[in-house]
Amino acid sequence: MAKSPARRCTAKVRRVLSRSVLILCWSLLGAAPAHADDSRLGWPLRPPPAVVRQFDAASPNWNPGHRGVDLAGRPGQPVYAAGSATVVFAGLLAGRPVVSLAHPGGLRTSYEPVVAQVRVGQPVSAPTVIGALAAGHPGCQAAACLHWGAMWGPASGANYVDPLGLLKSTPIRLKPLSSEGRTLHYRQAEPVFVNEAAAGALAGAGHRKSPKQGVFRGAAQGGDIVARQPPGRWVCPSSAGGPIGWHRQ
């Protein structure tokens, strides 16, 4: 029995949709990570240094904590910009020499104690030497320590994050995530982020972006990573039936 024109049309539409879903999956799993990794951070000391003190998030923000990592170095060692940015501070802060950089997407990184070799307003990139490491960081057990910090937002209301979670050497993959209201719970006990480059790659793969903000912010809570979403969110169909997002693996 011959199929009616309506049924033939429906079957054709289904085939086209199936191919579209396959293309979406390949672009999501293949292209997006490569673009995202291009904008992740590099080590500010070379070769990659020993981490002598880890990040310890304060909760809430005004409580004591360690809002960065301490990296072992030597006095006078060159300190590099961790990525493309603009210098927003270079000088003394509370008697300590500090350099602060603003990266695309709202991320800021800070470096201390560093005697600046750059000026405010100067654009820098990963190969740029921004200053020389000085001795005297409190609690440092090495000849000198670089305190490297990272934060989202302005200093007055900054959300401090572990800069080690932003390094290019940290592999990232796409995985389906469980959702509870407007909070995504990640299985890994480390920070997770979506930066502007990753956001652009995901948008190219058919995702929707918040009109106000394209960044997930992560924080460790009870062994889970909880990424609170901005208004709107990135969403994409998955075989697990949940949204897909970035996380460390």
Curated annotation (Swiss-Prot):
CDD domains: M23_peptidase
Keyword Lipid biosynthesis in annotation: no
Gene3D superfamilies xref list: Glucose Permease (Domain IIA) (2.70.70.10)
Gene Ontology molecular function: metalloendopeptidase activity
Source taxon at top rank: Bacteria
Cited InterPro entries: Cell_wall_metabolism_enzyme, Dup_hybrid_motif, Peptidase_M23
Annotated spans, Disordered: 227-249
Signal peptide range: 1-36
SUPFAM superfamilies membership: Duplicated hybrid motif
Name of the featured protein: Uncharacterized protein Mb2915
